[in-house]
Amino acid sequence: MKNARFLSSLVATVATLSLLAPSFASAERLNKTIETLAAGQAAFGIFSGDRSLSNARSLSRSELDYILIDMEHGPYDVETLQTFLLGMTNKAEIKATNSLAMNTTPIVRLPTNGREMNQYLVKQVLDMGVFGVLFPMINTREEAENAIASMRFPRAAGETDDGPQGLRGRSPGTAVWYWGTGYSEYLSKADVWPLDPQGELLAVIQIETQEAIGNLEAIITTPGVGAIFIGPSDLSADIGLPRSHPTVEAAIQTILASCIKHNVPCGITTSPNDIAERTKQGFRFATVGGDSGISPRTERALNIGRETAGRD
């Protein structure tokens, strides 16, 4: 009953924000993680499979830049995703800042691997209002291009760029009121950065296999890729060696070097023990925790990362 009242209140609040959208600066950046990365800074987040309202509220008030909502190793459930996103709506923050920009950016990791060339799951999570998608197991440029295309609306006649033509169908009503924009404004903002410098969607490509490393340059230079994320556990499993083995670390450094070369933010999972080193190496999209939420361990890693990156 309490949850029902809470959801009713949040739905009414976000719907009202959509009506009040013109009072906010239309040129403001809604995706603060993109704002951080575009400034050349490091962004820090966590993986989370806990889609409870209490966890959403806690994470939205934290100093985390983003949350990777894990629907790969957790259930793919759009309804619980919608509840979680509503729980991240911080009315006090909106009032205090007079800004629709969320303090912590929600990004979804999908359950499908790149070779499955999926599109409809991307459309569903974007239609709920998320600001980014993490695509696991991308091994080729073709798979990366499909990922980017699935996030984009088709271009209008006469509009061209270097990226793949959009494949996303138009029915973003929920996302429109969640973002607090008008329909036309949403369509103009809901494109991938940095291909569209004003785009508010972040496409994160996960590199987890030797095949992907063999196609690294082609994947990283795919127009529309906003960040690369290394999956060290699956990468080590694919190589057939422990995660701590020098060969695995050499593969990680190969990926990082290519990202730095092409000025594409690179991410990896970390802990308080290695976040400072990874940040110094050049990782700019590191996670600092998991489903324990903002535990003392996660908070310690976050603080170390922010201090090392010069963000405190």
Summary of predicted features, one role per range:
Residues 14, 24-312:
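Expand to "…catalyze enediolate/carbanion chemistry for C-C bond making/breaking, isomerization
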Residues 1-12:
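Bacterial N-terminal signal peptides that target proteins for export
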Residues 10-22:
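Bacterial N-terminal signal peptides
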